[in-house]
């Protein structure tokens, strides 16, 4: 039986799920200085040569998103803490349980009564997390990393890339020492990333619904993802308040920041030390 299953699996045609690469992947990555000038070439990690799998990226995103869901339940005695009983049959009234009292007390306990129990309350044991295999998860992350290197995928996601010299955008390690927002803005302008930050700033809108009262007043589009080599890099404090910008250490890369909404192709700024660290990760 197992051999038949394996045989059928090997005969599966995965071509509909593997997107053809829109252009030839670059084997060398261009490194730019803080002033935006070309500095050198470095060998591209294998992650950037991975086939792009939107189906796996979407699946990994839903798995990571559902892992945040909080189990919900209700108090077992909710709606049942009343002294009530049914009057029985033969009185020309519904057999619904009623409060004890004079005349015809109102109904209680039943789901269709005021203050009664819920018919189908949320269960704590309900499975909320969509599981994913470890190898699938790593493959999805590598595929999402590869999508950041293609201008067509990044532009299709809505990012402004007209002034970006090349993708992926890699900057020298000295950029991680920047600790002022003014200097970080100059870096973004030199690399052609600032127009995308302005796009995110213009897209900030007030949320519809009750979320406004619950600490989620504004909806903000995603713009540039900055990947650094270390969480202690001063650059993190310099750029974290830019509209739509996320900063993450390379060893903490995840599908939620690489493909927000499950859509690959986020505009990403890599530092050269982060690219070197990436070579041994998610393989």
UniProtKB/Swiss-Prot annotation:
* SUPFAM superfamilies, per the entry: Ribosomal protein L4
Q: Does the keyword Ribonucleoprotein apply?
A: yes
Report the protein name in the record: Large ribosomal subunit protein uL4
Assembly, in brief, is: Part of the 50S ribosomal subunit.
Keyword tags: Ribonucleoprotein, Ribosomal protein, RNA-binding, rRNA-binding
Annotated GO CC locations: cytosolic large ribosomal subunit
The Swiss-Prot or TrEMBL record describes its family as follows: Belongs to the universal ribosomal protein uL4 family.
Tell me what organism the protein belongs to: Pyrobaculum aerophilum (strain ATCC 51768 / DSM 7523 / JCM 9630 / CIP 104966 / NBRC 100827 / IM2)
Ribosomal protein keyword on record: yes
Quick one: a GO biological-process term for this protein?
translation
PROSITE patterns, A to Z: RIBOSOMAL_L1E
Q: Looking at the Swiss-Prot or TrEMBL record, what is one Pfam family this protein matches? A: Ribosomal_L4
Purpose of the protein: One of the primary rRNA binding proteins, this protein initially binds near the 5'-end of the 23S rRNA. It is important during the early stages of 50S assembly. It makes multiple contacts with different domains of the 23S rRNA in the assembled 50S subunit and ribosome.
Q: Which GO terms describe its molecular function?
A: RNA binding; rRNA binding; structural constituent of ribosome
Q: Which residues form a coiled coil?
A: none
Classification from the root reads: Archaea, Thermoproteota, Thermoprotei, Thermoproteales, Thermoproteaceae
InterPro entries per record: Ribosomal_uL4, Ribosomal_uL4_dom_sf, Ribosomal_uL4_euk/arc_CS, Ribosomal_uL4_euk/arch, Ribosomall_uL4-arc
């Amino acid at each position: 039986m197992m051999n038949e299953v394996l045989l059928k699996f090997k005969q599966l045609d995965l071509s509909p799920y593997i997107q053809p690469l829109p252009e030839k992947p670059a084997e060398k990555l261009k490194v730019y200085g803080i002033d935006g000038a070309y500095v050198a070439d470095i060998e591209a990690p294998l992650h950037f040569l991975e086939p792009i799998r939107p189906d796996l990226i979407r699946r990994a995103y839903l798995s990571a998103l559902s892992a945040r869901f909080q189990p919900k339940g209700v108090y077992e005695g909710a709606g049942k803490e009343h002294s009530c009983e049914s009057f029985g049959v033969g009185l020309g009234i519904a057999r619904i349980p009623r409060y004890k009292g004079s005349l015809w007390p109102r109904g209680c306990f039943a789901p269709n009564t005021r203050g009664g129990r819920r018919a189908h309350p949320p269960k704590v044991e309900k499975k909320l997390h969509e599981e994913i295999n470890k190898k699938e998860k790593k493959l999805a992350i590598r595929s999402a990393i590869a999508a950041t290197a293609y201008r067509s995928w990044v532009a299709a996601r809505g990012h402004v890339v007209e002034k970006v010299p090349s993708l992926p955008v890699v900057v020298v390690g000295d950029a991680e020492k920047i600790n002022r927002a003014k200097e970080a803005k100059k870096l973004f302008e030199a690399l052609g990333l600032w127009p995308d930050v302005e796009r995110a700033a213009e897209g900030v809108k007030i949320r519809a619904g009750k979320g406004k009262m619950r600490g989620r007043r504004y909806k903000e589009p995603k713009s540039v993802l900055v990947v650094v080599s270390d969480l202690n890099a001063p650059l993190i404090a310099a750029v974290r308040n830019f509209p739509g910008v996320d900063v993450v250490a390379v060893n903490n890369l995840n599908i939620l920041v690489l493909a927000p909404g499950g859509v690959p192709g986020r505009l990403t700024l890599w530092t050269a030390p982060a690219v070197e660290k990436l070579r041994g990760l998610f393989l």
